[in-house]
């Protein structure tokens, strides 16, 4: 992986957030707190940038599990205000009007977009900006919901790979329990990122860095990492198929 100066990265991100908030004339940030490392790290960076009093966390569970307690731990350890909103009745009300029963993936996307609506409702009401929590690993592979968790005003982690977020979280003092837990999008019970992606984040990041940033030939990646070409092509496919998720809608030019 690249040799990133994590302390310098923290300063770059916090300066960016402070400047953008001032430019916008907004009163602070609203962040969805899931109980995972990405939202925790984004919240810690935001609080460092603009003060804890200017950061609101929204905890928006669908299932009753330990994620809510982890999310509360993040907010309380950091000292930011937070609200808990159970999205299950909202999602169920929406689904009841569809005329069909959505499959697991569609339901997960509905959950994610419901959270986005709640984040922006609070941000609009409070004259604040929504901070996204997606990292570069998710962004490049399309592992996010379009117009759901991929929607935000600013995304402080968007140029950090997942393995780099872990290192920055340690420096910021994110609780160890959060750093050590298995990454999950929380879209259904028992779901984990790495199971759904079909690859560990550590290997994924090594491949992505070489494939996307260095534009290294596949054969060289195989040689350096000691993996099969099929594994590299699998990641390459994730990047290619998710291109539409990384840009605004486009049409033909005339």
Swiss-Prot record:
One of its GO terms (biological process) is NAD biosynthetic process. Pathway: Cofactor biosynthesis; NAD(+) biosynthesis; NAD(+) from deamido-NAD(+) (ammonia route): step 1/1. It comes from the Archaea. One of its GO terms (molecular function) is glutaminase activity. ATP binds at residues 32-39, 133, 162, 184. Keywords: ATP-binding, Ligase, Magnesium, Metal-binding, NAD, Nucleotide-binding. One of its GO terms (cellular component) is cytoplasm. Its EC number is 6.3.1.5. Deamido-NAD(+) binds at residues 113, 146, 153, 244-245. Mg(2+) binds at residues 38, 138. Catalyzes the ATP-dependent amidation of deamido-NAD to form NAD. Uses ammonia as a nitrogen source. Belongs to the NAD synthetase family. PANTHER family: GLUTAMINE-DEPENDENT NAD(+) SYNTHETASE, NH 3 /GLUTAMINE-DEPENDENT NAD + SYNTHETASE. NCBIfam families: nadE, PRK13980.1. This is NH(3)-dependent NAD(+) synthetase. It comes from Thermococcus kodakarensis (strain ATCC BAA-918 / JCM 12380 / KOD1). The lineage of its organism: Archaea, Methanobacteriati, Methanobacteriota, Thermococci, Thermococcales.
